[in-house]
Amino acid sequence: RSTLFPYTTLFRSSIKKEYYQFLKENRYEKVSNGIYIHPEAFEDRNYILSLRYPQAVFSHEEALYYYGWIEREPIRPTLTMYTGFGVGRLNKEGVKVFTVKKEFLNEGKVMGKTFFGNPIPIYDRDRTICDVIRSKNWFEIQNYQYAILSYVKDDNKDLYQLMKYASMFHVKEKVRQTLELLL
């Protein structure tokens, strides 16, 4: 007797029926392919995005908000993906997407928690501020300045790590000029 079930065999069996029967009986609603939510639960936008696009990392304004470095929640989610990933669907959904070379995507990636306590991938403080300085023209000036000042005051910053990221992304001089007067 085999313990391996090909995808098609598994879903031809009654498991699929039982699964959908459970969802129906408990009034779960489809949010996306393979993702269902109970009508009494709060929809956690960022957690759902992380399930739908597991290779994406929350970044830029989304990370700034997570660390408390901007005052208001971003209107649009902000993700970083690897160059070459088709971002058209995400853009249509109102998600702002930045791209990097595939080998840099996971540099500085850590796991954070959404407001609802669900795990999501997000960049660490130093990678976040490096990305902000790299993408300065994308930010409103007051958000940019507030983020830089917040980073400088943050006890958990790691300037050595920041300069490693700055070197990796070829913005070492830009980072140095931005921070030298504040440190």
Where are these regions (language model features)?
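Single conserved hydrophobic/aromatic residue that forms the stacking wall/gate
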Residues: R1-T9
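A short acidic, leucine-rich amphipathic alpha-helix
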Residues: T8-R12, A63
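Short alpha-helix boundary/capping motifs
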Residues: R12-S13, P54
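Short amphipathic alpha-helical interaction segments
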Residues: S13-K24
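Nucleic-acid-binding surface
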Residues: V31, I35-L183
